[in-house]
Swiss-Prot record:
HAMAP family with a match to the protein in the record: UPF0235
Protein name per Swiss-Prot or TrEMBL: UPF0235 protein RPC_0058
Pfam family, one: DUF167
Protein family (similarity comment): Belongs to the UPF0235 family.
Family matches, as SUPFAM superfamilies: YggU-like
Amino acid sequence: MTEAWRYSAQGISVALRVTPRGGRDDIDGLETLANGRTVVKVRVRAIAEGGEANRAVTELLAKALGVPKRAVRVLSGTTSRLKQVAVDGDPNELGEALRKLTAPKPD
């Protein structure tokens, strides 16, 4: 499985599949879509209305990656479950943090 993020000089760009009204705010690992694209599965309690789910996603990622909220922004997919999100910061540290967050969880 390939990584669901790309590195840049400013940080990383992460492909997400978001489940609004998912019961809890959490990162559920990686998923390969039917087209072969790898995404990070994210669920949030917020509803997908008025940008609430997008705000919840950016807050969740900021907290999980240890960056300020202003360092996370939705690049594309604001009205879609599939989103591209930019995270500003050290790309190597962010990539390592995402690897740990998306690693398979023991049963």
